[in-house]
């Protein structure tokens, strides 16, 4: 749930429009496919602007500092962001990231888990993320392993429902939900972001 760079990572609402063509590692691969060539197209909506198209493509594996990772290219609003994903026996996480296709990668510390094993209802973990200049610790919980989700691409059953919530001392807070479908990945994501203004009032953003 990293919000630096051009995308706010998974912190916007999206609905799967057309997806591209079991154990811990098998379950991780099922809910977060990392096969090269897979492609996802989403419609991103926000109360801050017009709907946009987001395309995510898995590229061929490569090495960063001797670690094998899978680059996932995000294309949104004419800009490109690449997250370098790693899966091991602890889960699926963002190991590094890069702004654009030719920029050098930078390591993500601490690691940001998209999924952490075991994949089971009630499993939870924390991660640190940035929202603009604000740093938040976000609690992540698998609330369900059997949700049904309807989006423009169709109806998906047996989805993971993951809740993400965090707030810092500056009054910035996040409440988000993601749904992962077996063999597809994320099919829906939505988030509410609240910030305090200089006058002390709270402003909110709902992306659905």
Where in this protein do the model-derived segments appear?
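Positively charged n-region of N-terminal signal peptides that target proteins for export
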Residues: 1-5
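Conserved functional acidic sites
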Residues: 24-208
């Amino acid at each position: 749930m990293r919000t630096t760079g051009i995308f706010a990572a998974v912190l916007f609402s999206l609905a799967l429009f057309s997806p591209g063509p079991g154990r811990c590692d098998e379950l991780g691969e099922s809910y977060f496919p990392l096969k090269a060539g897979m492609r996802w197209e989403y419609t991103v909506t926000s109360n801050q602007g017009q709907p946009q198209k987001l395309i995510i493509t898995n590229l061929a594996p490569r090495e960063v500092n001797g670690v094998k990772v899978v680059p996932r290219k995000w294309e949104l609003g004419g800009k490109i962001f690449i997250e370098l994903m790693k899966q091991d026996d602890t889960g699926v996480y963002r190991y590094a990231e890069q702004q654009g296709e030719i920029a050098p990668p930078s390591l993500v510390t601490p690691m940001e888990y998209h999924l952490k094993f075991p994949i089971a209802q009630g499993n939870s973990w924390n991660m640190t993320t940035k929202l603009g200049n604000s740093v938040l610790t976000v609690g992540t919980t698998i609330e369900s392993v059997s949700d049904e989700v309807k989006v423009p691409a169709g109806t998906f059953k047996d989805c993971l429902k993951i809740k993400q919530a965090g707030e810092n001392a500056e009054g910035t807070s996040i409440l988000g939900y993601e749904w992962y479908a077996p063999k597809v990945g994320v099919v829906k994501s939505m988030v509410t972001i609240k910030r305090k203004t200089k006058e002390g009032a709270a402003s909110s953003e709902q992306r659905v």
